Amino acid sequence: MTEAIPKGSLGSPLLTFPPLEEGVLVKRYKRFLADVELVSGEIVTAHCANTGPMTGVLHPGGRVRLRHAPSPKRKLAWTWEQAEAPSSQGGLCWVGINTALANSLIRAAIEAGHLKQVLGPIAAIRPEVTYGSNRRSRIDLLLTPDANCSDTRPIYLEVKNTTWNEHSLALFPDTVTERGQKHLKELIGVLPESRAVLVPCLSRHDVQTFAPGDSADPRYGELFRLALTAGVEVIPCCFGFHRDKITWEGLRPTKTTQS
């Protein structure tokens, strides 16, 4: 279970948790499964909460970190949380690969006041609210601004876990994503009555800028630029991943194209 930490400077803990178990990735298969050899030599099967190819991050033989959470309600007692990958700054960088954690990270950053400058003061946060043209989509976070805010429109906020790094440029997506394309269209649809915000959750500390992954999904790149023109805001948030905590590493600027 993670614990939110009060706001602080860059590099300060945002979430803390019991130390993760380290091991070496043997293989990933069937998208949701990964075999890992622990330090003890035991080989365990972990749940992989990431359906993408994890470009530049998936390295059999590389170091990984797992969370041990046995429960009668879970088929697997282990969850793959982090992977060590080559860093654009030289050396290696720990990357957060659990996409299910991204929403909690962004919510914690908002509650800690890290996004107040760009979002304004927030009075309430509601997760997974139904919206869209056919009411079949769910927005990750629906924010209600403080009554004294200069812009009191509701804020529809979509989060995208981002792990792909090319020369310090964080890129999303790393594969064709019709779901991601749909989310951009839905964000455009709430304008101008509401604010629409895309938040790339940059789950590695070694990136300096965010851009759409045009080479992986050209259509997503086109829709991304259309969304910017329509008034969708993009707020990339960067985090550092450690064995027992996740740190706030600040906001990052956005490029409109990968090249």
Swiss-Prot record:
GO terms for molecular function: DNA binding. Signal peptide: none annotated. It comes from the Bacteria. HAMAP family: SfsA. NCBIfam families: sfsA (TIGR00230). Belongs to the SfsA family. This is Sugar fermentation stimulation protein homolog. It comes from Prochlorococcus marinus (strain MIT 9303). The lineage of its organism: Bacteria, Bacillati, Cyanobacteriota, Cyanophyceae, Synechococcales.
